[in-house]
Amino acid sequence: MDKLIITGGARLDGEIRISGAKNAALPILAATLLADGPVTVGNLPHLHDITTMIELFGRMGIEPVIDEKLAVEIDPRTIKTLVAPYELVKTMRASILVLGPMVARFGEAEVALPGGCAIGSRPVDLHIRGLEAMGAKIEVEGGYIKAKAPEGGLRGAHFFFDTVSVTGTENIMMAAALAKGRSVLQNAAREPEVVDLANFINAMGGNVQGAGTDTITIDGVERLHSASYRVMPDRIETGTYLVAAAVTGGRVKVKDTDPTILEAVLEKLKEAGADLTTGEDWIELNMHGKRPKAVNLRTAPYPAFPTDMQAQFISLNAIAEGTGAVIETIFENRFMHVYEMHRMGAHIQVEGNTAIVTGVPALKGAPVMATDLRASASLVLSALVAEGDTLIDRIYHIDRGYECIEEKLQMLGAKIRRVPG
């Protein structure tokens, strides 16, 4: 297993390009199955989960064509099997996203139940109930969800989500795109990635209205046609590099991004004392060498502060002036990185879903271990400001969500290198 070695103390300075958003790319790739012709998806991040999704298509008999710009062409007409096998699904929970499109387009699907994700329980019952509301017959047996559309195909339905679910909203929205009649999804997720998926469905000739609000209306169409689409930028990667600049007292400009999808995070960075300037597709943060001020925050569904930025702000608070409380309302078990940060000298108390962080003047380099994707990013940020060397183990977690993290940080002046395990 690869490791990262980071020597702290360098003030970050420079410009980097932000990659496409994994959490938009995965549902958009799944939605290509709805089309009746070839579809091209561009700005895909070069990440393991994306490769797994493309491999899953290969298993189904679809041969994706990848060009030199990392755009992928998928022709779902060549599909031979409607099964998403366990050995692929277990490595990537987002494989559940092929369930809705396959049932809608081909009338049946067999998708392995995803295994446990490191962050608490993420049930798939909303996906199942949503499809049942549209007339699908579903059995769960032998660790597989087996779904069949009724005679004549799925029917539009009104469906209320008991809890806000991003992948649940996406799965049912994709299924509804080809269902007969109108579907109304209430208490739907409002995330920008949901909006990106709706825009993609509409680019193929679909009729999705209201994405970005909590009520999405989908009028099913007979067919969806070929299209070419570019995935939105990654707001979490954007936020992570801005926090990296803030903790090191540096100046970083992130390009090919969108400031409007990150407002809650930018607000907190201003509160921490950062100077921010934005353009249509760029954000520049300058700390002028100052130490950040601690901030209080509470995670909640979009447009509030994103849970995927919580760990990074714990790193910021760990070296900030003052004390900040971080309240996690989305996932359980989301403070696993705190115990690794203790090894670096951080002062953090966890009480239930709250972490109280008292800033210290400096952290100390230490061997630490990544436990999940965003937690691992917080360890990288802490290592950038720690005295001496930090060795981060199990960085495959980082590689799941950050494209070329060491190259991008090196471009900003960080002392970081990857060593093979």
Curated annotation (Swiss-Prot):
Single annotated GO MF: UDP-N-acetylglucosamine 1-carboxyvinyltransferase activity
Binding site for phosphoenolpyruvate: K22, N23
Reaction catalyzed: phosphoenolpyruvate + UDP-N-acetyl-alpha-D-glucosamine = UDP-N-acetyl-3-O-(1-carboxyvinyl)-alpha-D-glucosamine + phosphate
Enzyme Commission code(s) on record: 2.5.1.7
One GO-annotated biological process of the protein: peptidoglycan biosynthetic process
Subcellular localization: Cytoplasm
Domain of life: Bacteria
Record: residues binding UDP-N-acetyl-alpha-D-glucosamine: R93, R122, P123, V124, D125, L126, D308, I330
Active site: C117 (proton donor)
Top enzyme category: transferase
UniProt-listed InterPro entries: Enolpyruvate_Tfrase_dom, Enolpyruvate_Tfrase_sf, MurA_subfamily, RNA3'P_cycl/enolpyr_Trfase_a/b, UDP_GlcNAc_COvinyl_MurA
Any GO CC annotation of this UniProt entry: cytoplasm
Sequence positions bearing 2-(S-cysteinyl)pyruvic acid O-phosphothioketal: C117
Keywords: Cell cycle, Cell division, Cell shape, Cell wall biogenesis/degradation, Cytoplasm, Peptidoglycan synthesis, Pyruvate, Transferase
Pathway: Cell wall biogenesis; peptidoglycan biosynthesis
Record has Cell division as a keyword: yes
Family: Belongs to the EPSP synthase family. MurA subfamily.
Function: Cell wall formation. Adds enolpyruvyl to UDP-N-acetylglucosamine.
Protein name: UDP-N-acetylglucosamine 1-carboxyvinyltransferase
Species for this entry: Pseudomonas putida (strain W619)
